[in-house]
């Protein structure tokens, strides 16, 4: 334990006394304007170089390299390896959702928002929300269309949840897997300037599906024209994100191959959108048909009994 005298304050003498004790000491006049300090204190409220780089986004490369190194530090069979793909904050997720809803012409979604730091948190929950939005909206749509009809008996179609989940998750994972394999194969033949990892492609496809969540809710409106207008708008927004993202990856390839790749991407996207609309919302209600078919038999039986 320290002595009591060691814990007391000690008063130092003035500068003259100190210089007399050590005449060889180096002195600097802080009021001299010709003297510059290497580490000057910043005034309150000012930003340093690191804060400026963070606001301007100039230190993204260092951060992405650090994140990439963290992901490679753990083996792929460990939980910590996959945990890094869900390590995103709310701001990053909202920023990527905003980028998928408001695509910037001529801008690459991966380079602008993902920055070599793909996440699976957004795509997973976007697909899950879309599955329930389509299934619930499809049931409500059929109910509202036949509301008030005496021969209609509403039966909840829970199988639509499993069907929607199979379709959405298969599209969000299998199509990126096939596209990644194709781009990897073409990159071995033609040295492309832009290349994407599998998780970056999954991230792009996952966030591009967000526009269909409000679209599926609005599909409840029992007007076929409104539904097709909504699906056209959703296709235009999400399709432009996919086209502007993957065109730089194939434009250095053969012209026909590049165009065929983009056309295939868009056709699969159209097939998903139109297929969901046609199956979950425009499909005929089978529970309504038997009542209409048995009506003539009931009329004949009533005539015979009379």
Swiss-Prot record:
Cytoplasmic compartment spans: 1-119, 184-200, 249-256
Gene Ontology molecular function, alphabetical: small GTPase binding
Biased composition range(s): Acidic residues: 50-59
GO annotations of cellular component type: Golgi apparatus; Golgi medial cisterna; Golgi trans cisterna; late endosome membrane; trans-Golgi network
TM ranges: 120-140, 163-183, 201-221, 228-248, 257-277
Entry-linked InterPro entries: Yip1_dom (IPR006977), Yip5/YIPF1/YIPF2 (IPR039765)
Protein keywords: Endosome, Glycoprotein, Golgi apparatus, Membrane, Transmembrane, Transmembrane helix
Pfam families: Yip1 (PF04893)
Keyword Transmembrane helix: yes
Membrane topology value: Multi-pass membrane protein
Regions of this protein lying in the Lumenal compartment: 141-162, 222-227, 278-306
Glycan-modified residues: 297
Family listed: Belongs to the YIP1 family.
Subunit structure: Interacts with YIPF6; this interaction may stabilize YIPF1. May also form a ternary complex with YIPF2 and YIPF6.
Annotated protein name in UniProt: Protein YIPF1
Organism: Rattus norvegicus
């Amino acid at each position: 334990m320290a002595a009591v005298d060691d814990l007391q304050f000690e008063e130092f003498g003035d500068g003259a006394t100190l210089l007399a004790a050590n005449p060889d000491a180096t002195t600097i006049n802080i009021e001299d304007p010709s003297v510059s300090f290497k580490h000057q204190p910043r005034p309150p409220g000012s930003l340093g170089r690191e804060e400026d780089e963070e606001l301007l986004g100039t230190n993204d490369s260092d951060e992405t390299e650090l994140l990439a190194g963290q992901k490679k530090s753990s083996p792929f069979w460990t939980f910590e390896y996959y945990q890094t793909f869900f390590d995103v904050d709310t701001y990053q997720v909202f920023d990527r959702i905003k980028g998928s809803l408001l695509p910037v012409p001529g801008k690459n979604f991966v380079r602008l928002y993902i920055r070599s730091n793909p996440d699976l948190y957004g795509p997973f929950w976007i697909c899950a929300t879309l599955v329930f939005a389509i299934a619930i909206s499809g049931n409500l749509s059929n109910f509202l269309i036949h509301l008030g009809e005496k021969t209609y008996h509403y039966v909840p179609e829970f199988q639509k949840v499993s069907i929607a989940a199979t379709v959405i998750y298969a599209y969000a994972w299998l199509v990126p897997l096939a596209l990644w394999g194709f781009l990897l194969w073409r990159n071995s033949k033609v040295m492309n300037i832009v290349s994407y990892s599998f998780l970056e492609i999954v991230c792009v496809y996952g966030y591009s599906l967000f526009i269909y969540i409000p679209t599926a809710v609005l599909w409840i409106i029992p007007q076929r024209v409104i539904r097709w207008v909504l699906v056209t708008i959703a296709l235009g927004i999400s399709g432009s994100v996919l086209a502007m993202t993957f065109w730089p990856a194939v434009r250095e390839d053969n012209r026909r191959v590049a165009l065929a790749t983009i056309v295939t991407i868009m056709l699969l996207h159209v097939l998903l959108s139109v297929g969901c609309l046609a199956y979950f919302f425009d499909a005929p209600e089978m529970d309504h048909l038997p009542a209409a078919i048995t009506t003539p038999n009931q009329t004949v039986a009533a005539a015979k009994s009379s």
